[in-house]
Curated annotation (Swiss-Prot):
InterPro entries associated with the record: Endonuclease_NucS, NucS_C, NucS_N, NucS_N_sf, tRNA_endonuc-like_dom_sf
Organism: Mycobacterium sp. (strain JLS)
Underlying gene: nucS
EC class of the enzyme, as a word: hydrolase
Keywords associated with the record: Cytoplasm, DNA-binding, Endonuclease, Hydrolase, Nuclease
MF annotations from Gene Ontology: DNA binding; single-stranded DNA endodeoxyribonuclease activity
Name this polypeptide is given: Endonuclease NucS
Length: 223
């Protein structure tokens, strides 16, 4: 991973356009090819980013060089580097990834087997659908064929909603999947998390773990 602290301006050019005026920012260039731009006031969420596969090149600008990050669809993240204050590279090795606790892993398995709990006509596309920022628990399609990303938690809190929001922002950049809606599924969801999810257009679903454990893999068991 390469970490660069620089005075820079940033322009996103693609289906949408966005401009960040000159400021000191952290630029992260990861080994998977992704590039993200961070400020000091947004926790872990980048100001803008480009997901892999993409290519980073440098153009000679006047008066400053321009880093051009381009993805396979031709969208560009153009970073005009006015001054570099820090530039270092680090080999972090292979990360083992986030390991879900036993209950969350079992909830994911059960919901994948009984995807109809999400709604009539839902079908499973894939469990652990990989993205540049981690795996989405379930990627499904609703009764109309539209993509739905499902994040599963034992306890639904604000950080889980934020995590799903990041997945949705990324998935909706994929023209083969967009539009992608979200479902936040948990055994219990805190009021603040539900409010945030509703505000972002994410549907909340309460999972009854005991009932789901009483289901066979191919039919409901009544008890």
């Amino acid at each position: 991973m390469r970490l660069v602290i620089a005075q820079c301006t940033v322009d996103y050019v693609g289906r949408l356009t966005a401009h960040l005026p000159s400021a000191r920012r952290l630029l992260l260039i990861k080994s998977d090819g992704s590039v993200s731009v961070h400020a000091d006031d947004r926790a872990y969420k980048p100001l803008n980013w480009m997901s892999p596969p993409c290519r980073l090149s440098e153009e000679s600008g006047d008066p400053h060089p321009v880093w051009v990050v381009e993805n396979k669809t031709g969208e560009q993240l153009r970073i005009t580097v006015e001054e570099i204050e820090h530039d270092s590279s680090h080999d972090l090795g292979v990360d083992p990834g986030l390991v879900k606790d036993g209950v969350e892993a079992h909830l994911q398995k059960l919901l994948a087997e009984h995807v109809e709990l999400l709604g009539a006509g839902y079908t499973l596309v894939r469990r652990e659908y990989m993205t540049a920022i981690g795996p989405v628990d379930l990627l499904c399609r609703d009764e109309t064929g539209r993509s739905v990303a499902v994040e599963i938690k034992r306890r639904g809190e604000i950080d889980g909603v934020e995590q799903l929001t990041r997945y949705l922002e990324l998935l909706n950049r994929d023209t083969l999947l967009a539009p992608v809606s979200g479902v936040f599924a948990a055994q219990q969801i805190k009021p603040q998390a539900r409010t945030l999810a509703n505000d972002r257009g994410i549907r909340c679903l309460i999972l009854d773990y005991d009932q789901m454990r009483g289901m066979d893999s191919d039919e409901y068991r009544l008890f």
